[in-house]
């Protein structure tokens, strides 16, 4: 949806294409996304947009970073995150938390589903818990 970026737990990409090629293909759906914006998004998550390595050779953490780049390349007003730190090493988690906090400070609304209390503490102003289909405000 326009104005919304979504990060899923296990992003799927075309294995025989580079990270840039995958995002370029998706960007064709939104003609307003330039190659430079795609490259900037890839750089923001700590990947090299000029890297020709095929996504099939990416580590799980690299694919997760590319998924985050995909979600932010349209500069969405709202980011929906499903376990956004899955597959990232300690350094990657720290980098992505900093990026997401920066986006939040710039006015992006962030909705996060996570089992990680630290992600929730760092990224969320309000916390809700879902249990047996019931949603309860925690704080």
Question: Which role fits each region the language model picked out?
Answer:
Residues 68:
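Hydrophobic anchor residue at the start of the ABC signature
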Residues 94-106:
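Helical segment within the ABC ATPase nucleotide-binding domain
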Residues 114-115:
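H-loop/switch region of ABC-family ATPase nucleotide-binding domains
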Residues 90-91:
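Helix N-cap at the start of a conserved alpha-helix in ABC-type nucleotide-binding domains
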Residues 79-83:
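Catalytic Walker B motif of ABC-type/P-loop ATPase nucleotide-binding domains
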Residues 24, 33-50:
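Conserved ABC ATPase "signature" region
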């Amino acid at each position: 949806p326009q104005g919304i970026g979504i990060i899923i737990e296990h992003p799927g990409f075309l294995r025989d294409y580079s990270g840039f090629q995958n995002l370029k293909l998706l960007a064709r759906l939104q003609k307003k996304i330039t190659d430079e914006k795609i490259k900037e998004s890839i750089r923001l998550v700590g990947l090299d947009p000029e890297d020709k390595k095929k996504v099939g050779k990416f580590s799980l953490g690299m694919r997760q970073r590319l998924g985050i780049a995909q979600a932010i390349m349209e500069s969405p007003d709202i980011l929906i995150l499903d376990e956004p730190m899955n597959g990232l090493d300690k350094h990657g988690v720290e980098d992505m938390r900093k990026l997401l906090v920066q986006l939040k400070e710039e006015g992006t609304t962030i909705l996060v589903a996570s089992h990680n209390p630290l992600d929730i503490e760092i990224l969320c102003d309000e916390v809700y818990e879902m249990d047996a289909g019931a949603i309860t405000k925690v704080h």
